[in-house]
């Protein structure tokens, strides 16, 4: 039981003084709670207890191989990072394998990068032109596969060289994402 905490519950309501009971590593009760006989009690000293924060534009992933505790993030209360920004991403299969083989102390979600799709469909040496219709179809197919494997969707970085020549490919990809029935 953690008593005397300033609870922010994530619902948007004002913080409040409360207690939180944890049983079997899960929150079981929240409120004005009294301790059970022989229950371990921690005085929260009025400190804030809040749900973990989500860093929706993170570049921490590369450092997690050297620091799986993710201390730069977890020390800030971040429990989930979202990667795949700026148009670049790892394939979902690679990401899943990496996280299975090298577990980290933080949740990781990913977008699929637009420039990554362009590179896979067009070849890295061909990025300095607009995509051909058959390459656009490949990009949509790759994006659909990645979303079925857990990608959050499409992310761009149009200010980066690999995306300078995108035009229809970006529009086509965003149309797919918005009309997609991928869960």
Region annotations inferred by a language model:
Residues 44-49, 53, 58, 66-156, ...:
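Divalent-metal coordination cores built from histidine and acidic residues
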Residues 1-5:
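Conserved N-terminal strand/loop that marks the beginning of ABC ATPase nucleotide-binding domains
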Residues 38, 91-92, 164-165:
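Short secondary-structure boundary/hinge segments and terminal tails
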Residues 62:
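Active-site-adjacent substrate/metal-binding segments within catalytic domains
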Residues 10, 86, 159:
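Flexible loop residues that form catalytic
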Residues 154-183:
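Active-site core of metal-dependent hydrolases
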Residues 7-52:
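Histidine-rich, glycine-flanked metal-binding segment
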């Amino acid at each position: 039981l953690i008593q005397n905490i300033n609870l922010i519950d994530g619902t948007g309501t004002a913080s409040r003084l409360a207690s939180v009971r944890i049983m079997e590593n899960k929150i079981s009760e929240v409120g004005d709670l009294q301790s059970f006989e022989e229950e371990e009690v921690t005085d929260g000293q009025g400190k804030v207890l809040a749900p973990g924060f989500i860093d929706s534009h993170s570049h921490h992933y590369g450092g997690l191989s050297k620091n799986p505790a993710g201390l730069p993030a977890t020390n800030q209360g971040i429990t989930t990072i979202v990667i795949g920004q700026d148009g670049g991403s790892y394939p979902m299969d690679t990401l899943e394998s990496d996280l299975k083989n090298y577990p980290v102390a933080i949740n990781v979600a990913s977008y699929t990068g637009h420039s990554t799709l362009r590179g896979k469909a067009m070849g890295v040496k061909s990025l300095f032109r607009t995509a051909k219709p058959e390459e656009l179809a490949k990009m949509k197919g790759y994006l659909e596969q990645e979303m079925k494997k857990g990608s959050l969707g499409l992310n761009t970085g149009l200010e980066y060289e690999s995306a300078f020549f995108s035009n229809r490919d970006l529009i086509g990809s965003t149309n797919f994402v918005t009309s997609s029935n991928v869960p």
